[in-house]
Amino acid sequence: MESYFPSGAIANHSFIRASSPASTPLSPPTQRSNALSNRLTSVLSASYADSDIRDALETLSLRGVHNTAETRRQLRLDVQKEVVECNAEIVRDFGKVAEQLQRIGTVISSLNQTCEEMRQHIVRAKQDTAPVIEEASALMNQKKESETKQQLLDAFVKHFIVSEDDLLVLTSAEEPIDDRFFNVLDRVKQVHHDCEVLLGGENQRLGLELMEKSSRNLNSAYQKLFRWIQKKFKSLNLEDPRISSSIRRALRVLAERPSLFHSCLDFFADARDYALSDAFHYALTDTVSGSGGDRNVKPIEFSAHDPLRYVGDMLAWVHSTTVSEREALEALFVADGEEIAKGIQAGLSSEPWSRIDEGEEVSFDGRKALNDLVNRDLVGVSRALRQRIELVIQGHDEPVTCYKVVHLLSFYRATFSRLLGTKSNLADMMQTLEKFTFSRFESLMLEQVNTLSNDHAALTPPDDLSAPEFFLDALEELTSLMKTHDASLEAEDAESESTAENKFTPVLRVAFDPFLQLAKSSAAELPDATARAIYTTNVLLTARSTISAFAFASATHMDPISTALSSLRMELLEIQHRYLLDASGLGVLLTALEPFAPSPTISKPESEGKDGHAPPQVDKQPTDIAEIADLPAFQPEALIAVGQQLDDFLPSALMDATDNLKHLQSASFVQSVTEEAVEAFCRDFEFVEGMIIGADEARGRVHIKRMEDGSDAGVQDDVATESGKVSDGDEQESKLRRLFPRTTGEIRVLLS
């Protein structure tokens, strides 16, 4: 923006302010000088930041005004001139507008006059045509009413009246069941339903007559449909996977009459029951109602000598037939299940007597209906199957085969439960046959046990004390049973259980526990306790090795066997310990030392702890320990004899001890028992050694005391020195220690 002040204005202003105080001959008077000064001060003090001043300056800048002296003098005049010119132009424009408004007013007046004339003409015309229009309106209304009545009549006839041709298609037995039949049936059902609307009017006669007629036609149509379905069911080939769509549609429609629908299903079930029973008889004997069959396929009866194969073939045939029957009927009840359910629900309203329980809501389950129908189709087959399985099981005496049949029945029970439901006839029959076969298995095992109980020769333990032959045979049978169970689906459930009973536990109770009890009770035939313990241990070890390979058997029977083996191990440990004491002669010394022991006799096995070790020694000894040397067993001749017996025993001690349990069939078991018995023997020897040393020291103290008291001089050969200790020379060699020189360290080395 250009400045409105000349470039020299500021300098001139400074010059004026600087020179104003000076007095010159040419300067104006003082009053004028003050006025100018005030004016300048006012101008200079004005704020050019004011918006009004800024807008005014911008307006001047847009007009192209230059800040000159001439412009400043003419500025007011120029502005006033422009204002006058603008006002004059506005006045001229308003004059033109006034002229146009006058012309518009003239036109409007002319239009008003014309409209008034037209209004008068219209009034006169209306007065002239009013009678004609009224007459025409009355005629039009009459025509409209007539057309409406005709339309209603046509619609009523079209909707509620069924032609004779259609009724003939619906009720005549000569007419086929096709799409036209179903279309006419749908129309009659709609007419019957719509008659309810007619019953809501004042005149109900027409509605009642139409409803009665439609009801008769519907009943005739459903009867015709029922007979047609029965006829089709007689010739229905379920082997053909493509069941006629007309049959499926007919069943959906017939479901609206529940009584006819269920009668139709009953007829179908009876027909299929006869057909499947005949087919099963054909599969068994290769003849159907006396007619010849295919010679290339062997009848199932050919394998009747093998119960497992015979039962398996029959069950396989029944399963295959059940699957085929279910797949063939699935299109009828699963694919169209919703439509059938709707039809049954609608039919219950027309047949209220079909309800068994009025308060119960009836719903159709297609899969349940399918399973029920398949069950009914197989009633005859199930009856024949049960009779044959019961006969073949009753005539068979092999327990393992019976148990395999039990598992076969269990497998098919689970299969039929998944296929037809847990409450199906086939599943129930499989469960009944499973219980029957297992009862037969139990009776066979009980017969074996009773036979063995009366066979004294079979119960006699072998000379080598191994498990008896009958028990090995029973374990072999049990192994076959466990392998059969392990290969089945039920074994998976047993693996998840720890000590709880599983499905194999009843088998162990009849096929294992009685034979184990017989084997254990037969040990009473042995007169020797060692032989009885070894024999019983061999029996339990054999049993444990048999059931340990199967988790479901170990879950319930391993702990009792392990507990019994632990008890027998303690008994064998005591036997080995007693053998070492008797063979070495150390038992005589331990028996003699019983009164001097700080606790009950150490040498007796009963004094040992549960681990077979002797009780810990007590440092405190009886005060009369010196009297040990006076005992008969510790006299020189007897003690020397015991020492000699010990020396003769030690070189072959381990071999002899192992040979003492040579009939025990587990080498590791023999080794562990012998090692613990040797350890107990070493502790006993350490006790005897300590008692001998203690007796020598006690006798030495007694002799020293006697010398100090001036006692008898006849024992001065054994007097101690002045220091109170027994001499280490020839005098000490005459003590008990000299007669029994073996040390515990030597014993441990020789027995290691």
From Swiss-Prot:
<feature type="region of interest" description="Disordered">
    <location>
        <begin position="600"/>
        <end position="620"/>
    </location>
</feature>
<dbReference type="Pfam" id="PF20653">
    <property type="entry name" value="COG6_C"/>
</dbReference>
<feature type="region of interest" description="Disordered">
    <location>
        <begin position="709"/>
        <end position="736"/>
    </location>
</feature>
<dbReference type="Pfam" id="PF06419">
    <property type="entry name" value="COG6_N"/>
</dbReference>
<feature type="compositionally biased region" description="Basic and acidic residues">
    <location>
        <begin position="725"/>
        <end position="736"/>
    </location>
</feature>
<dbReference type="InterPro" id="IPR010490">
    <property type="entry name" value="COG6"/>
</dbReference>
<keyword id="KW-0333">Golgi apparatus</keyword>
<dbReference type="GO" id="GO:0006891">
    <property type="term" value="P:intra-Golgi vesicle-mediated transport"/>
</dbReference>
<dbReference type="GO" id="GO:0000139">
    <property type="term" value="C:Golgi membrane"/>
</dbReference>
<keyword id="KW-0813">Transport</keyword>
<protein>
    <recommendedName>
        <fullName>Conserved oligomeric Golgi complex subunit 6</fullName>
    </recommendedName>
</protein>
<dbReference type="GO" id="GO:0017119">
    <property type="term" value="C:Golgi transport complex"/>
</dbReference>
<dbReference type="InterPro" id="IPR048369">
    <property type="entry name" value="COG6_C"/>
</dbReference>
<comment type="function">
    <text>Acts as a component of the peripheral membrane COG complex that is involved in intra-Golgi protein trafficking. COG is located at the cis-Golgi, and regulates tethering of retrograde intra-Golgi vesicles and possibly a number of other membrane trafficking events.</text>
</comment>
<dbReference type="GO" id="GO:0015031">
    <property type="term" value="P:protein transport"/>
</dbReference>
<dbReference type="InterPro" id="IPR048368">
    <property type="entry name" value="COG6_N"/>
</dbReference>
<keyword id="KW-0472">Membrane</keyword>
<keyword id="KW-0653">Protein transport</keyword>
<comment type="similarity">
    <text>Belongs to the COG6 family.</text>
</comment>
